[in-house]
Amino acid sequence: MEAPCPDKIWQDAGGAFAIGYVLMGVVNIGLGFKRSPPNKRVLYTFALLRKKSPKFGGNFAIWGSLFSGFDCTLSYIRKTEDTVNPIAAGALTGGILAARSGWKHSVQAAAFGGIFIGIIEAFQHMMQKRMQAQQEEMTQQHLEERKRYEEERKQREGERKKLNENGKSKKNKQQQNGENDLD
């Protein structure tokens, strides 16, 4: 379940910061060991981590908060939650973040942001359909197994009743035969 919009913006900003921080941390570890002098690899790597990871995480947080803000605003204005909102939010975010570079770069970034989020939404929709089909298949299998189990149970109960009836009739016959022998 998604959080309400104000909370969603904060959650997405924090999540984006964490993703950016970790990604840049991994990149800086690789770069630190590759570019550093052999006797100062660890110090150089940690210096890169302290310097660049928070900045990169902050950039991701800005992107995440802008994206969530636009997504929530579009949801409020359009009164719907569909795939158009995130795609438009991605385009708006890309355009706003590239606005300082001029119109040409802003339009290119907006197109890239919209296309990128559109690809993510298409993949998410495809995975959701696949999971839904698997869920329906599992439900159908469960219903078939349950039906088979119920049929087997009824069959066993029928067999038990027959055995009980046969056993009672044999006892009755034996009792009658025993009474006849006494006479």
From Swiss-Prot:
Gene Ontology cellular-component terms listed: TIM23 mitochondrial import inner membrane translocase complex
UniProt membrane topology term: Multi-pass membrane protein
Family named by the database record: Belongs to the Tim17/Tim22/Tim23 family.
Keyword annotations of the record: Membrane, Mitochondrion, Mitochondrion inner membrane, Protein transport, Translocation, Transmembrane, Transmembrane helix, Transport
Stretches with biased composition (Low complexity): 174-183
Bias (Polar residues) ranges: 131-141
Segments traversing the membrane: 13-33, 57-77, 107-127
Biased composition range(s): Basic and acidic residues: 142-168
Region (Disordered): 131-183
Entry protein name: Mitochondrial import inner membrane translocase subunit tim17
Biological processes per GO annotation: protein import into mitochondrial matrix
Role noted for this protein: May be involved in the translocation of transit peptide-containing proteins across the mitochondrial inner membrane.
Primary localization: mitochondrion
Superkingdom to which the source organism belongs: Eukaryota
